[in-house]
Regions:
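NTP-dependent nucleotidyl-transfer catalytic core
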Residues: 1-178
Length: 178
């Protein structure tokens, strides 16, 4: 949902001006980060903005063409900025895995786990895993559960991480990952 927060701020504060990182003399990832900060400030006075960002994520996952086009533009700005930093520091990667390309694998795996009883559907409709065996049971009742899919079915970071781990394993056939 974080990129959607930046996207919403872009629409509110920059789109009408035709702002781009180039126009503002900024690296792309810095510009998208600035949009996120602007969203955070805006949402403190406009609490409905959080819901708007969540609705934008639902539309993104549904494939809404307008939302996807804005996402692609901002994702490209971010990735280009990050790649610029890596190039400047001499860091290279064999392959980039984008969460947008792996989240569906993660969702599929979570749904398989739900069918097998590895995961469970919480009262609020979200899909979760009980991690008590790993983290122990503390005072916070929710600390022993990890949300894997939101109640509206949209992905969270761990959904994407699961899909990315599967993709990396498919590509590299490793037996350990650090």
């Amino acid at each position: 949902v974080h990129i959607c927060k930046s996207m919403l701020a872009y629409k509110l504060f920059h789109e009408a001006n035709g702002d781009t990182p180039e126009k503002l003399g900024m690296k792309g990832d810095h510009f998208v980060g600035q949009c996120y900060v602007e969203f955070d400030k805006y949402s403190k006075e406009h609490p409905e903005a959080g819901k708007q960002a969540e609705e934008m994520l639902v539309k993104w996952e549904e494939g809404d063409s307008e939302i996807r086009a804005l996402w692609q533009k901002m994702n490209d700005w971010t990735l280009n900025g990050v790649k610029e930093t890596y190039a400047r520091t001499g860091v290279t990667f064999d392959k980039f895995y984008l969460e947008s390309e792996t989240y569906l694998k993660g969702k599929d795996e979570i749904l398989k786990g739900l069918e097998k009883g590895v995961f469970f559907k919480a009262d609020d409709g979200s899909v979760r895993i009980d991690v008590t065996d790993v983290v122990g049971k503390g005072k916070d009742e929710d600390a022993h559960e990890k949300v894997l899919l939101r109640k509206d079915g949209t992905s969270v970071y761990i959904t994407q991480d699961i899909g990315t781990a599967i993709s990396r394993h498919d590509d590299w056939q490793f037996n350990q990952m650090v």
